[in-house]
């Protein structure tokens, strides 16, 4: 048996490799011969390839195994540009290579060559491939122009590339071609123009579309009925429906075009989008005059218009009319009608229409389900909304972003923000990635329930998941930071908003200015407002209003008025709310001459005083003791048919108590609070509130107005009224009755005592000499989680001093810093008065020196006088504030809350 030696075996096994290598070397040698030594294309190669192509010897060309390059292909196309078949063959051969693809320059040559040969189908195919290369439209256009100049061919390609760009939605590139092709002897065709116009409108570029139409007319391109329909649609979508109507009529008369149902449907839809029923009727009349038949789209637009206006009966009538016309309602029409019912809160009718749709065999879709979910959520029927969400799977429908966002919003509005967050996680599992809109809904949800720390946590989660915040996200976070009192973080976020260019409108600006002013940082707010023009954001009236209110809050009334004057110079006129604030400020800081000026000015501007305006005036007159002017303002309200509310009545009653007009105050309280209903059998209070025969006629008139004209629902007693009643009893010396009323109110479950209620009673007990009861009430406050403040302790110190127990009062003073409470001028003045009366003048002088060191002494006080207000109900510090409860201020009287702020 013959066996091969190892050397022979190796040689035998290497034969195929050696043969292949020999062939490859030959090919490379040929390719080297075809190129010059420096890598450039050799003329003889170009000549040989061109000759084979011209002779049609394509098989021989394939055998050459050409090493294609951009230079080789472009050279051949340039050489054979008058032979489209040869060019097409070499281009296709090059396109089939494994390691080579023609570049954009080759494509530009090829489309010109094919266009000249009138091979438009292949030209368009290659143009689509050229666009798919994703080269810059400007670069492609430049090369097409260069080839056009080099070859001296027809510019037909320019119109074709315009149409391709338009059809692909690349309107920016299409517009560049449209603007420049006229320079090279080619105007756009009507088909290309229509394609460009249609895609511009589809992308929402309505104003650009109208401008393109004007250019098209200037190019003397005659529009057809399709052009007119597109332009009408552009006008309608930009909100200029009347202009669309004028354009349609002018086109009809000047161009002699017969507008079709598409044009009229666009007009009807335009009027429908703005809820103009009369406009829709005019178009319908025009259709009848022109003999244009209505179709399903026509009726769908009519239903949309009626739904937009909330005229659901008319919408249903149109829906029934469709059946009489033997037209079949489609999915879209059902969806429009159901959405109308959902938006108007008629969810049962929406479900009825949906059931009818399913019954006749029309399939539901995601948009319809979204409308139903939205309707259920808005009516608070979350369970039903969840059922629709679950049934979408049965209907083979996939929830989209809008579905989830609607349901998330429903949970948030109902206060179930944690459930909404779980649904957000479920979105991720279903591969529906939450968008910034989803997170905005969640952020608003947490903010709405006051969970501001959760707002911060959600913000961090959003950023961690790679979701870019928008202006709404930032404004919500800013609001949360201000609520938490975090000034530094708010400023950092504001700088980030500016750096990212998110300040596009006044939403975030208003939140920033308002937040800073509420923190009494008006200088920072003013600085931001001064620099905001750099970012092309124009402040609105609400922006200036917030700044003006901020100055009012910090006591700088001059700057508050300066803001008003500045905005007027800018052509922005103050609202009634701003006037209300300035009126309150003029009263508070005793600029009474400005009050009348403001009232005259607001009337001259055509503004109507609101209940808040009258409340500010009544509060102001009461605060300075001018009860007659307060009465006159009340009578003006009554004459104008404006209802007196509980806050205004409480304010007047409180002022009457302060002026020792107890009978008149009681008469008003009787009309505000039905104590017989609230506390049946409470005879002592009833006797106290019974007015005497000497009651002022003006007060009687107001009381009768309250009884006769004020809806009971507007006079539901609140803490203010009850506090006024308790204060009135204390003022009248009926401390036991006040305590009994307090006890009975607690048992009625209609009253939640606050720190100010306790302060009233503590003050009453202390003044009456029952200091032990006063301290017991103080302890009761603490047990209920209500923290006593300086006014509470001032009342206790006053009671101790009145009993002559000055030592205990001093000990209580020394304990205040341990409780985190800072003594004020009232504290020291009360104790000084007690020390002087007890004969300890030296200690009184020491405290006086301490007051001076702490800056608590003003003007004449440094000479030894004590400035204590004369008109008080309980204590010069106590007043009912704008929050609905009593505020404490050492420089103001006990006062019902500022009605203007409360109502606003």
Curated annotation (Swiss-Prot):
Name the domain of life this protein comes from: Eukaryota
> GO terms for CC?
mitochondrion
Which stretches are PPR repeats?
Answer: 154-188, 189-223, 224-254, 260-294, 295-329, 330-364, 365-399, 400-434, 435-469, 470-504, 505-539, 540-574, 575-609, 610-644, 645-679, 718-753, 754-788, 789-823, 824-858
- Sorted alphabetically, which Gene3D superfamilies does this protein's record hold? Tetratricopeptide repeat domain
Keyword vocabulary terms for this entry: Repeat
Which GO biological process categories is it annotated with? mitochondrial RNA processing; RNA splicing
> NCBIfam families per the record?
PPR
Into which family does the record put it? Belongs to the PPR family. P subfamily.
Q: Which PANTHER family match?
A: OS07G0671200 PROTEIN (PTHR47934:SF2), PENTATRICOPEPTIDE REPEAT-CONTAINING PROTEIN PET309, MITOCHONDRIAL (PTHR47934)
What is the protein name stated in its UniProt record?
A: Putative pentatricopeptide repeat-containing protein At1g19290
Q: Which organism is it from?
A: Arabidopsis thaliana (Mouse-ear cress)
């Amino acid at each position: 048996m013959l066996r091969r030696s190892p050397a022979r075996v190796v040689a035998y096994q290497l034969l195929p490799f050696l043969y292949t290598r020999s062939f490859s070397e030959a090919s490379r040698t040929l390719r080297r011969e075809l190129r010059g030594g420096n890598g450039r294309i050799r003329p003889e190669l170009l000549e040989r390839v061109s000759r084979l192509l011209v002779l049609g010897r394509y098989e021989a060309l394939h055998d050459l195994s050409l090493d294609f390059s951009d230079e080789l292909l472009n050279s051949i196309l340039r050489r054979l540009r008058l032979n489209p078949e040869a060019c097409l063959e070499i281009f296709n051969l090059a396109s089939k290579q494994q390691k080579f693809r023609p570049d954009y320059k080759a494509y530009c040559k090829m489309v010109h060559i094919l266009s000249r040969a009138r091979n438009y189908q292949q030209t368009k195919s290659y143009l689509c491939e050229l666009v798919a290369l994703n080269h810059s439209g400007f670069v492609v256009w430049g090369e097409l122009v260069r080839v056009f100049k080099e070859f001296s061919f027809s510019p037909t390609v320019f119109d074709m590339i315009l149409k391709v760009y338009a059809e692909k939605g690349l309107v920016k590139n299409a517009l560049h071609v449209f603007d420049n092709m006229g320079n090279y002897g080619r105007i756009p065709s009507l088909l290309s123009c229509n394609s460009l116009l249609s895609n511009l409108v589809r992308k929402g570029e309505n104003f650009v579309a109208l401008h393109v139409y004007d250019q098209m007319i200037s190019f003397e391109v005659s529009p057809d009925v399709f052009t007119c329909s597109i332009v009408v649609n552009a006008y309608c979508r930009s909100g200029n429906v009347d202009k669309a109507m004028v354009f349609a009529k002018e086109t009809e008369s000047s161009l002699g075009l017969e507008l079709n149902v598409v044009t009229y449907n666009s007009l009807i839809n335009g009027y429908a989008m703005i809820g103009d029923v009369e406009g829709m009727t005019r178009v319908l009349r025009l259709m009848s005059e022109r003999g244009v038949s209505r179709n399903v789209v026509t009726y769908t637009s009519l239903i949309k218009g009626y739904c937009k206006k909330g005229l659901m009966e008319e919408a249903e009538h149109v829906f029934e009319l469709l059946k009489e016309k033997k037209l079949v309602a489609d999915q879209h029409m059902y969806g429009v009608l159901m959405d109308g019912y959902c938006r108007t809160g008629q969810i049962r009718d929406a479900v009825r229409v949906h059931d009818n749709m399913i019954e006749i065999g029309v399939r539901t879709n995601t948009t319809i389900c979204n409308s139903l979910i939205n309707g259920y959520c808005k009516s608070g029927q979350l369970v039903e909304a969840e059922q629709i969400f679950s049934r979408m799977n049965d209907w083979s429908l996939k929830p989209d972003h809008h579905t989830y966002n609607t349901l998330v919003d429903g949970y948030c509005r109902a206060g179930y923000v944690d459930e909404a967050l779980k649904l957000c996680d479920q979105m991720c599992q279903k591969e529906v990635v939450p968008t910034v809109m989803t997170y905005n809904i969640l952020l608003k949800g947490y903010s709405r329930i006051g969970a501001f720390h959760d707002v911060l946590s959600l913000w961090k989660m959003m950023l961690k998941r790679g979701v870019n915040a928008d202006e709404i996200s930032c404004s919500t976070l800013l609001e949360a930071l201000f609520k938490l009192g975090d000034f530094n973080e708010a400023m950092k976020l504001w700088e980030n908003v500016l750096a990212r260019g998110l300040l596009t409108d006044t939403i975030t600006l208003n939140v920033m200015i308002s937040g800073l002013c509420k923190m009494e940082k008006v200088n920072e707010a003013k600085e931001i407002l001064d620099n905001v023009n750099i970012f092309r954001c124009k402040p609105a009236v609400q922006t200036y209003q917030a700044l003006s209110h901020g100055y009012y809050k910090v006591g700088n009334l001059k700057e508050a008025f300066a803001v008003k004057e500045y905005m007027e110079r800018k052509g922005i006129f103050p609202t009634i709310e701003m006037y209300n604030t300035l009126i309150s400020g003029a009263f508070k800081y005793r600029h009474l001459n400005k009050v009348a000026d403001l009232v005259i000015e607001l009337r001259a501007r055509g503004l109507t005083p609101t209940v808040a305006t009258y409340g500010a005036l009544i509060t102001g007159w009461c605060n300075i003791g001018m009860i007659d002017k307060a009465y006159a303002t009340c009578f003006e309200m009554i004459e104008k048919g404006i209802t007196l509310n509980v806050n205004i009545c409480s304010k007047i009653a409180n002022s009457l108590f302060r002026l020792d007009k107890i009978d008149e105050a009681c008469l008003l309280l009787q009309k505000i609070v039905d104590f017989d209903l609230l506390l049946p059998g409470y005879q002592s209070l009833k006797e106290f509130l019974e007015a005497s025969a000497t009651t002022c006629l003006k007060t009687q008139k107001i009381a009768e107005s309250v009884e006769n004209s004020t809806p009971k629902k507007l006079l539901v007693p609140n803490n203010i009224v009850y506090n006024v009643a308790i204060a009135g009893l204390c003022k009248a010396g009926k401390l036991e009755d006040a305590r009994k009323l307090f006890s009975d109110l607690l048992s009625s479950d209609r009253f939640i005592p606050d720190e100010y209620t306790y302060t009233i009673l503590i003050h009453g007990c202390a003044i009456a000499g029952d200091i032990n009861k006063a301290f017991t009430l103080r302890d009761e406050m603490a047990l209920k989680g209500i923290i006593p403040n300086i006014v509470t302790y001032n009342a206790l110190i006053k009671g101790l001093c009145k009993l002559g127990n000055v030592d205990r009062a001093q000990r209580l003073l020394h304990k205040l810093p341990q409780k985190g409470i800072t003594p004020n001028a009232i504290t020291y003045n009360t104790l000084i008065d007690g020390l002087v009366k007890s004969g300890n003048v030296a200690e009184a002088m020491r405290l006086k020196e301490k007051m001076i060191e702490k800056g608590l002494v003003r003007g004449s006080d440094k000479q030894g006088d004590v400035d204590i207000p004369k008109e008080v109900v309980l204590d010069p510090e106590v007043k009912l504030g704008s929050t609905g409860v009593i505020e404490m201020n050492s420089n103001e009287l006990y006062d019902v809350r500022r009605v203007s702020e409360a109502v606003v």
